[in-house]
Amino acid sequence: DEKSWHPFGRDISENSQVALHISASIFYQLFGFNSSLYDFVIIFPLVIGSLTAISVFAFVRVLGGTTAGLLAALMFSISAPIFTRGLIGWFKSEPLGLFFAFLAMYLFVSGIMYNKGKFSFIKLIFAGLFLSLGLSSWGGILFFLIPIIIFYLILPFLKREKNFIIWAAPVFSVSLILSLLLFERTSTFTIGYAGLVVGFSTVFVVVCELIKKFSNESKHVQNCFIFLTSIIIAMIGVFASGIVSLPGFRYLNAMNPFLTSLDPLTDSVSEHMTTSISTSYIFVSVFIIFGIIGIWFLFSRKTIDLKIDKRIFALIIGITAIYISSSFVRLEIFASVGLIILGSIGLAILFKKILESNIFSPTKILFCGVILGLFLTPVILPEDLSWTSWAEFPPTILHGGSFFQISTNDWPDAMNWLKNNTTEDAIIASWWDYGYWITTLSDRTTIVDNATVIDWQIKKMAYSLITTPE
């Protein structure tokens, strides 16, 4: 794309969300119904976000049952961090990435937790494919690799099937790696840190199954633990040697929230601000209560009948999601994901216990009323700052990034003025927030834009804007 990042241009295949473009194109051909492409992509994130609720239901249903799945879909549909990243007009990476990710997670857990032969084989293959599509749509989907890898490291200590895990884990991993090679941007993951940890964890699963097969049963845990220690030391050694490059700063920051202050450019972006306690409560509110209930039940041995592998996977993905979200305000979307999984399972267990008990019927009705009240509170209160009021905010281009629910044509008119009053070969210097608008609506070349491809070029632009011309 020679109209962005002048004079270098942008290699779309190398650093763009190609799966988003391909998916939008396919959906447009199937469901465009003679509408313009512009109108279609405005509606696209809204439709995909709605469909994601179905994949959330399917995923959580495998972990906690049908009631938990339905509650998860409900919580997903009213979660402010999620629907604010998928509003009408938000043709960005998160909605489609989450859709593919939850679909992949459903196929993964249903494939690896139930030995159904060829059906598990097919599910695990498609799980790898859809997760790679999610990664191509949004880099943040790398998060979903974390619980899978941790689960791999715990899997040999949980599963007793001698011949199932030894092929199930490699099938998913190979499918994922081969699918990542479909796109230039994601293919770099296979030879980088992501491919390394997936490869090491898969080797660990296979070798542990072989160890259990050829060693005394009394020494299974001991031998697997020794091998796990050696795998971790080997991974640390590879990273320390520099053979494999470390993740980018944003990904390192997600693992260590305190790194934010080390990079002024990252810290200057409003959505990259470190999450505060008050901000977290605004975003997830009563979901925190539901999540705590879920953690309590999942750690309890006597009160629930969920299989140990399901409980552990739910705890892994829930707790890691909450931890990752502490890095950036933008990543509160993962706090919501974690609390939705934990909270829906916790509420499903609580509902079952209360409604099946011998408690006086009015008490059961009161309990349902309290839960309903907790659900409704952040949705309708406070009046001007409720979650539903967030959905009424127009796209940024219509309100200039202000905190007021206004809608003006100032920016569209400005883009139209640029298009009609500058030459076609004009190069527009602006802050990166406006690069996409100028390129797409004004059809003019820009120096920086929202892709933040070249950090030093953004810094030079910032210096130019804040200094006095000589």
Place the predicted regions along the sequence by residue:
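Membrane-interface coil-to-helix junctions
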Residues: 1-51, 79, 92-93, 99
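Membrane-embedded helix bundles of polyisoprenyl
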Residues: 43-62, 67-115, 119-157, 168-184, ...
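Extracytoplasmic
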Residues: 51-54, 355-470
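Membrane-interface catalytic loops of GT-C/OST-like multi-pass glycosylation enzymes that act
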Residues: 89-93, 186-193, 325-336
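Hydrophobic cores of alpha-helical transmembrane segments in multi-pass inner/ER membrane proteins
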Residues: 101-109, 145-151, 198-212, 287-296, ...
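Perimembrane helix-loop-helix junctions
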Residues: 116, 144-224, 349-353
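Alpha-helical transmembrane segments at the extracellular/periplasmic loop-to-helix junctions
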Residues: 194-209, 225-301, 308-311
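Hydrophobic/aromatic-rich transmembrane helices and adjacent perimembrane loops
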Residues: 315, 320-358, 362-366, 370
